[in-house]
Curated annotation (Swiss-Prot):
InterPro entries: PSI_PsaL, PSI_PsaL_sf, PSI_suXI
Pfam family membership, one: PsaL
Topological category with respect to the lipid bilayer: Multi-pass membrane protein
Keywords associated with the record: Membrane, Photosynthesis, Photosystem I, Thylakoid, Transmembrane, Transmembrane helix
Keyword Transmembrane helix applies: yes
Keyword Thylakoid appears in the UniProt entry: yes
TM stretches of this protein: 84-104, 125-145
Protein name: Photosystem I reaction center subunit XI
Gene: psaL
A GO CC term assigned to this protein in UniProt: photosystem I reaction center
Superkingdom, natural source: Bacteria
Family statement: Belongs to the PsaL family.
GO biological process: photosynthesis
Cell compartment(s), UniProt: Cellular thylakoid membrane
Amino acid sequence: MAETGYKQVVTPYNDDPFIGHLATPISASGFTKAFIGNLPAYRPGLAPILRGLEVGMAHGYFLGGPWVVLGPLRDSEYANIGGLIPALAMVLLATGCLASYGLVSFQGKAASNDPLKSAEGWSQFAAGFFIGGMGGAFVAYFLLENLGVVDGIMRGVFNQ
């Protein structure tokens, strides 16, 4: 049979099909590894409170959007505040879950070199998450409430 010249893109890890490793061109690429390595959970030398702050800001910022667009107040003038309040509630609930996870999982364990493997580290992470999440939700609310002004600034309307 003639060879078609087709090159298989997804191959077994180290050309051994019995290893069971699912390396794909996407998951094994340098870009993906660099992107995942720069997430706050994997960035070395970052204090737990700063990790929590960064994760919280991102979550607080995007949590309000679904309630603004799809919530029960979506067609009213109160849609933005109707997105802010549930986002704040979700951040508060997630903070409680993070804090209780840290208390339950690391109760009575010896101190570790990794700060996120201790109850104190998780407490700091949860505190940072709370501050960042609340701040992110309020920033998203502010931007939605003042969308006309922000749009004018971005378009350069006020600089003419």
